[in-house]
Amino acid sequence: YPIVCTTKRTVSKKYKGGVSDYNKIKRELTMLCKSHPNEHVTTMFDYYAMPENTPEIGLHDPDIYERIGKIEAAVNRDIGQANCMFHFMLHEFEGILFSNPESFELIAETDVVNKIREIRESYPTPEHINNSPETAPSKRLEKLIPNYAKIKNGTLISKDMGIDKILAECPHFREWI
């Protein structure tokens, strides 16, 4: 069963998302790994906008898969728990939604779906879609679909396209699964 990792704790509330410090991630994952020593602990953090103090995050290997593999390995070494398998989404969850542009027909007009298809066809895989903070997959979707709701629409679209389509289009995600 999934456990949602918290990124901040107060006396009255736990927070998730919006990671500002790698050490918070490390602390939470180390605690989870030690609390569940006979279970695998994995993550689904967005690579886009990870904190600067994440091990090896500054690597600039031109091959995104080589780069992300090195960063994930460095994080796993730093956490130092045998049952931890750190995984980054390339570049963020919304990237995998570009696996099947036709699924956007559920929430968008044909002209928008065509623009999403054009974006997808401009990259080797959906995992390559990201040029800058302004052109991250979620930013592109929010620009094209003004009422785009990340959780609601992302869930609807990913369910429509199905896991097999995502696995076929996204090698890093497939390797993780």
What is each PLM-predicted segment?
Residues 13-22:
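Non-catalytic terminal and connector segments of soluble metabolic enzymes
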Residues 1-12, 26-177:
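C-terminal accessory helical subdomains adjacent to catalytic cores in phosphodiester-
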